From Swiss-Prot:
EC number: 2.1.1.-
Protein residues bound to S-adenosyl-L-methionine: L38, E91, D117
Cysteine pairs bridged by disulfides in the record: none
Main subcellular localisation: mitochondrion
Pfam hit, one: RrnaAD
Protein name stated in the entry: Mitochondrial transcription factor 1
Top EC class for this record: transferase
Annotated keywords: DNA-binding, Methyltransferase, Mitochondrion, RNA-binding, S-adenosyl-L-methionine, Transcription, Transcription regulation, Transferase
Gene Ontology cellular component terms for the protein in this record: chromatin; mitochondrial DNA-directed RNA polymerase complex; mitochondrial matrix; mitochondrion; nucleus
Similarity remark: Belongs to the class I-like SAM-binding methyltransferase superfamily. rRNA adenine N(6)-methyltransferase family.
Molecular function as annotated in GO: DNA binding; mitochondrial transcription factor activity; RNA binding; rRNA (adenine) methyltransferase activity
Transmembrane regions: none
Superkingdom, natural source: Eukaryota
Length: 366
């Protein structure tokens, strides 16, 4: 079963060529009302084909959970590509009721519209308790072998700090097997505005290297499925000369658009990022890891040998252990890889004075 394409005229949000069945909303507060949505279905179709994700799923049993699709451009694209058994759509904006109800009808009920906001965590409990979302839970053995083959999460995230906070929480929950992580190694696809994109993808040597980007590298396998040249240029500008010379700084998108990837209603330049949970490392304490990353990233330009003192009295005695594990302790903290942070954390877990890591107040650097 294939759904008809949604053309720009039918998806535009108050644009100059809009047919008028949608109206300008009163954008407010922390909600998906601040989410822009993709209007170019051809681009979405092409990104999915290039991703080759179809082979990763059992379509006959697959559930797609989609947040803030707007009029359903991405809903149509995802449904046509994966042909899932169930496609649950979280969209609270009443203005999109007609196009979403139409998709529910055309899909013979396989698309289910839930009139709730995916920005709020209570929504996910509601759809789970009501059995609207009822995927199989992976066993630990299955998680060692592959990501979840029957559940995919897709979302347009809000712009500004709200979007950054949401993607940071997604990473926290997937790493701890909370939220959708309770079902196993769940893959997420996110259309992100430019600011959260740069924060999420900025790797070692990036001037604003964040806890969010370290968590992405440490706990997920990630790819950029689609990005514009302008977003890639902004990302490149944030790297030091040393990082550009010594490390792979480009996310190597599968699809690069020469023009901004247009969204409505905010005309934002979007990037499509894929993240999939890695198998859990039972030897790692995630709270200790998070504390260490937050503390050390407050002094990105300082060498590890000097910033180690922030981790507790006598922590410098651990430096030889770091060196033995291949970590360059004279390297600025901002150049450490996620693997370096993981190694440091496992060593410090055995350190008797690490308790203070959970008690200090560290400025949020997500």
């Amino acid at each position: 079963m294939k759904l008809p394409k949604i053309l720009y005229d039918a998806a535009a949000f108050g644009g100059p060529r809009s047919t008028g069945f949608v109206k300008i909303l009163n954008l407010n507060g922390r909600s998906s009302y601040k989410s822009s949505y993709l209007v170019n279905q051809n681009l979405m179709d092409e990104a999915l084909v290039k991703s080759n994700l179809l082979k990763e799923y059992n379509s006959e049993k697959m559930t797609i959970l989609e947040m803030a699709p707007g009029p359903g451009v991405t809903t149509t694209s995802l449904f046509n590509y994966f042909q899932p058994k169930s496609h649950v759509v979280l969209e609270s904006r009443e203005v999109f009721s007609k196009p979403l109800q139409k998709l529910c009808t055309l899909s013979d009920g396989r698309i289910k519209w839930v009139h709730q906001d995916g920005y709020y965590w209570q929504t996910y409990e509601d759809v789970y308790v009501s059995k609207v979302l009822d995927p199989r839970i992976q066993t630990e053995e299955e998680q060692k072998l592959s990501p979840h083959r029957e559940l995919l999460f897709f979302a347009h995230l809000p712009h500004g700090y709200a979007g950054l906070l949401f993607v940071s929480q997604i990473l926290d929950f997937l790493s701890a097997r909370d939220w959708l992580g309770i079902f196993g190694r769940v893959r997420v696809l996110l259309w992100l505005p430019c600011s959260p994109t740069v924060t999420l993808l900025g790797s070692r040597g990036f001037s604003k290297r964040s806890k969010t980007s370290v968590f992405r590298e440490a706990f997920t396998d990630s790819r950029v499925l689609a990005a514009s040249e302008s977003t890639l240029q902004k990302l490149c500008m944030g790297y030091s000369k040393e990082a550009k010379e010594n490390y792979q700084i480009s996310p190597n998108p599968l699809l690069v658009s020469p023009t901004p990837i247009t969204s409505e209603p905010h005309k934002e330049d979007l990037t499509l990022v894929e993240m999939c949970s890695k198998p859990q490392d039972k030897q790692l304490s995630i709270p200790v890891f998070e504390s260490i990353v937050r503390i050390l990233l407050t002094c990105k330009a300082t060498s590890l040998s000097k910033s180690i003192y922030y981790l507790g009295p006598g922590a410098e005695t651990l430096l030889p252990s770091f060196t033995q594990c291949g970590i360059n302790i004279d390297m600025p903290v901002g150049l450490l890889s996620a693997a370096d942070f993981l190694t440091i954390s496992k060593i410090i877990q055995k350190y008797p004075f690490k308790h203070h890591l959970h008690l200090g107040t560290i400025i949020e650097d997500s």
